[in-house]
From Swiss-Prot:
Domain of life the protein comes from: Bacteria
GO terms for MF: ATP binding; CMP kinase activity; dCMP kinase activity
Any single GO BP term: nucleobase-containing small molecule interconversion
Keyword annotations from UniProtKB, A to Z: ATP-binding, Cytoplasm, Kinase, Nucleotide-binding, Transferase
Residue positions binding ATP: G11, P12, A13, G14, A15, G16, K17, S18, T19
PANTHER family for the chain: CYTIDYLATE KINASE, CYTIDYLATE KINASE/PANTOATE-BETA-ALANINE LIGASE
GO cellular component annotations of the record: cytosol
Family indicated by similarity: Belongs to the cytidylate kinase family. Type 1 subfamily.
Gene that encodes it: cmk
Identification of the protein by name: Cytidylate kinase
Species whose genome carries this gene: Pelotomaculum thermopropionicum (strain DSM 13744 / JCM 10971 / SI)
Enzyme Commission designation: 2.7.4.25
Residue ranges the record marks as coiled coil: none
Pfam families registered for this protein in UniProt: Cytidylate_kin
Lineage summary: Bacteria, Bacillati, Bacillota, Clostridia, Eubacteriales
Length: 226
């Protein structure tokens, strides 16, 4: 295995991908790429511009003239820039969460962002998380992980995340939103949410995130010794 392999982490909303990917990138000294944040940035722009989320040609035109960049600040936290503006906090709003799957299902939007994502990973040493990293974006990634958890557990985690940002959402409502998002993500024509054939599937409903990270680090270490 390459000493600086690319690691693909996929899974549904709330499965813990971002937390695992962030910790893993720090542990290994790799670049962390949150592809979901990139789609959220495009969704935010669509909302701001008043683009109908059912208007796929309109969303395609929007994506074509949109710049999304990811940078790490002095504390090692990922910052998301939309056309030069830091939108790291705003893209996590409930409105964007509802819109992002509708934006991400547009083929031209995915093509635009996948191009950017592949360029970021061209040198290796990347931890990239999203919905179709191991199947579409980086099908040749040396390590592929698919994280999953029950809808109830994912809803609980998402509610806690939103509460920390000042948003209060009912648990039942959140479960319904998670379930609907799963439906959209798994049935879309472009890059549907499915595990890669060679991915390791990890159910982290009750598994501490530290244990998940330790398992993946062990895989990287074992590969380097081969």
């Amino acid at each position: 295995m390459n000493s600086f392999p690319n690691i693909a982490i996929d899974g549904p909303a709330g499965a813990g991908k971002s937390t695992v990917a962030r910790l893993l990138s720090k542990e290994l000294g790799f670049l962390y790429i949150d592809t979901g944040a990139m789609y959220r940035a495009v969704a935010l722009k669509a909302i701001r511009k008043g683009v109908d989320l059912a208007d796929q040609p309109g969303l395609s035109r929007l994506a074509a003239v949109t710049s999304v960049n990811l940078k790490t600040d002095a504390e090692g936290n990922l910052r998301v820039f939309l056309d030069g503006e830091d939108v790291t906090e705003e893209i996590r709003s409930p409105a964007v969460s509802k819109a992002v799957s509708l934006v991400a299902r547009v083929p031209a939007v995915r093509e635009r962002l996948v191009e950017l994502q592949r360029a970021m990973a061209s040198g290796g040493g990347v931890v990239m998380e999203g919905r179709d990293i191991g199947t579409v974006v980086l099908p040749d990634a040396e390590i592929k992980i698919f994280l999953t958890a029950s809808p109830e557990e994912r809803a609980r985690r998402r509610r806690e995340e939103l509460a920390a940002r000042g948003y209060i959402v009912d648990q039942h409502q959140m479960v319904n939103e998670i379930t609907e998002r799963d439906r959209i993500d798994t049935t879309r024509a472009a890059g549907p949410l499915v595990p890669a054939a060679d991915a390791e599937i990890i159910d982290c409903s009750s598994m501490p995130v530290e244990k998940v990270v330790k398992m993946i680090v062990a895989r990287v270490s074992a590969g380097r010794r081969e």
